[in-house]
Regions:
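Membrane-interface helix-loop-helix modules in multi-pass membrane proteins
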Residues: 28-34, 85-148, 159-163, 179-194, ...
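Flexible loop linkers connecting adjacent transmembrane helices
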Residues: 2, 60-87, 113, 127, ...
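Extracellular/periplasmic helix-exit of transmembrane alpha-helices
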Residues: 304-320, 375-454, 490, 535-543
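Transmembrane helix-loop junctions in multi-pass membrane proteins
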Residues: 25-37, 108, 120, 178-194, ...
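Membrane-interface "cap" regions at the ends of multi-pass membrane proteins
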Residues: 2-22, 53-108, 290, 330, ...
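Extracellular loop-to-transmembrane helix junctions
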Residues: 37-56, 60, 114-144, 154, ...
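Selective recognition of specific alpha-helical transmembrane segments in multi-pass small-molecule
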Residues: 49-59, 173, 178-180, 234-238, ...
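Loop-to-transmembrane helix boundary motifs in multi-pass membrane proteins
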Residues: 160-178, 370-379, 445-447, 465-476, ...
Length: 580
């Protein structure tokens, strides 16, 4: 615990005072603009200052005063080490694995959809929500699960709240988890369908991760930096070579898969990944994916500082009354339901009580992994908000409004957008579609295309050329697919643990991580559940993302409330009620 205590010197006080002043100025620029375009760099600075202050002071207070983290306390990864699920893991590798697991579709898609209300409401919730709720929940659940041998959320609820409450939480969490995984997987399917470049590059990360797992465990143990460089280089080569694969007549057709084919591939992959030892595929693949995730997000932030794009969307639009075309619902509660993971997410509680606590090497690492990981995800949400709001509002609504509102031609879409109170011309929509290499950008709902176009727009402004718009657009689509797929990996494994815990009430032997039958049963229920919903969404587009996303948002927040209730009860039992 002493290692976390930071000395407050005069230079340190001056630095943090400067950070606070910069943050205050940035918020002032965002909040006090009078109908003028605000530069996106103020949003980046405001977020960076909030995250820095929250991590330096608030998370340290929680770690030392509330949780009293002890570096000398043996973690379950050491006491129960089995080489399968309980494996002491380097804190940077585990941070990568945990971040990759929690950062799915939510922080990318949610803020983009919420941008129809303006950039300010969503930004405030992304920052305030994560500091006071989301990061605290992740930190809390990871802490209490690590102190309880890595038990799942449902099992801890049964232990702390009683058998009936525990079973209710287990069943509710399992149902919500299946819906969440279905939404995540469906977004991946929509992004990769008929995209040989994306399919090849995503598929290539599997053998690369297997190689990294074997390399770190048997060939060069402990050489984290070395294997990281190798894995990153191989992944970049896979992405670059994917363009050549897509252009090849034979291999391009081979890797061109329909939505149904991709669904079955994901089901098979999810089953295999969940039963393999965590060190072999899951941890190295998530760690590998994190390089791309964090690298792209930080690179995008630097790009915003260089390009200095303006936020074209108003701070607040008239759609806060619930009449918006992107999603129906007023500011409260639909803004919070829609943004979901970027501020607080119940899904994180399942990951923080599923795979991650079984891998913690030292208890003091929980602060960086739990609180820090969630701050990083919120920053992803901020980047998504910027990508949506740097676009002309007319273009934003042309991409995100459904076909029932826009029609099927650029002329009808331009007229529909004008009726919404914004201006866009058919020529603008046609030229933009050509620049990103698509036949049309109309009604490309789901958030992913908007993020990709916004990212391509920002990068093009850096180089003052739109010649590479198509490349950056498809790179961003690939990035989003990889971003989301890693959450499906870890979520399926966490779902397996939940099934084993429930069946273990009747058959105790099934609960053991060494039970091969329990592993197969839990995995089959997990992938069968979310696979069914994904398949239905693929064959019936009306029952896809548009229907599942509201269920995802509501269920996600409900699960977060369960986790916070459980955490509150445990803090009371620890005699920490004065901090609640």
């Amino acid at each position: 615990m002493d290692t976390m205590q930071a000395k407050s010197t005069l230079p340190s006080k001056l630095v943090w005072s400067l950070v606070a002043i910069i943050g205050a100025i940035s918020f002032g620029m965002l909040a006090l603009s009078r109908g003028e375009h605000v530069n996106a760099v103020w949003l980046v600075l405001a977020a960076a200052c909030v995250y820095s202050i929250a991590y330096r002071f608030y998370s340290l207070f929680i770690a030392t005063k509330v949780f009293e983290l002890n570096p000398r306390r043996l973690t379950p990864a050491h006491r129960l080490a089995d080489g399968l699920d309980y494996v002491p893991t380097n804190k940077y590798v585990l941070f990568g694995h945990h971040f990759a697991a929690i950062a799915g579709a939510g922080p990318l898609v949610g803020p983009i959809l919420a941008a129809q209300m303006g950039f300010l409401p969503g930004t405030i919730w992304l920052l305030v929500g994560v500091v006071l709720a989301g990061a605290v929940q992740d930190f809390l659940v990871l802490f209490i699960s690590t102190r309880r041998d890595g038990r799942s959320l449902g099992e801890m609820a049964k232990q702390e709240l009683g058998p009936f409450a525990g079973i209710v939480v287990m069943l509710g969490a399992l149902g919500v988890m299946i819906i969440i995984l279905a939404v995540l997987a469906l977004v991946v399917v929509k992004a990769l369908a008929h995209s040989p470049w994306g399919v090849f590059s995503i598929a290539a990360t599997i053998p690369i991760a297997l190689f990294m797992g074997v390399y770190m465990r048997f060939i060069r143990p402990g050489r984290i930096a070395e294997v990281s460089i190798i894995g990153f280089v191989l992944m970049m080569l896979a992405i670059v070579y994917g363009g050549h694969v897509a252009a090849d007549p034979y291999w391009g057709e081979f890797f061109t898969l329909t939505g149904t084919q991709l669904t079955w591939c994901l089901i098979i992959y999810g089953f295999i990944a969940s039963v393999l030892p965590v060190w072999l595929l899951l941890a190295p693949r998530d760690y590998l994916s994190t390089f791309l995730k964090i690298g792209v997000i930080l690179g995008l932030a630097v790009g915003i500082v260089i390009a200095l794009p303006d936020l074209k969307m108003p701070a607040v639009t008239h759609f806060i009354d619930g009449t918006g075309p992107v999603f129906s619902g007023s500011l409260f509660p639909f803004l919070f339901i829609t943004i979901a993971c970027g501020a607080i997410s119940g899904f994180h509680a399942l990951v923080s009580s599923g795979t991650t606590p079984k891998l913690v090497d030292n208890e003091v690492n929980i602060r960086m992994i739990g609180y820090g990981g969630m701050l990083m995800e919120s920053f992803v949400g901020i980047m998504a908000m910027i990508c949506a709001t740097v676009l002309d509002p007319g273009v934003y609504f042309a991409i995100n409004a459904p076909a029932a509102v826009l029609g099927t031609t650029v002329e009808s879409a331009a007229e529909a957008v004008r009726n919404l109170g914004f201006v866009v011309t058919p020529e603008m929509l046609t030229v933009l579609a050509q620049e990103v290499g698509e036949s049309s950008i109309l009604s490309r709902t789901g958030g992913a295309p908007t993020f990709a176009i916004g990212m391509a727009h920002i990068i093009s402004e850096i180089f003052n050329s739109r010649a590479m718009m198509a490349f950056w657009y498809h790179f961003a689509i690939l990035f989003e697919a990889l971003f989301i797929l890693t959450a499906v990996d870890a979520g399926t494994r966490a779902c397996r643990f939940m099934v084993q815990d429930m069946v273990g009430i009747v058959i105790p032997a099934v609960k053991s991580s060494g039970s091969f039958f329990g592993n197969l049963l839990g995995t089959a229920v997990a992938v069968g559940g979310w696979g069914f919903f994904v398949y239905q969404g693929v064959i019936d587009p009306l029952g896809g993302v548009n229907s599942l996303w509201p269920l995802f948002g509501v269920g996600n927040q409900m699960l977060a409330s369960m986790a916070l209730i459980l955490g509150t009860v445990i803090l009371f039992k620890m005699k920490k009620e004065k901090y609640v």
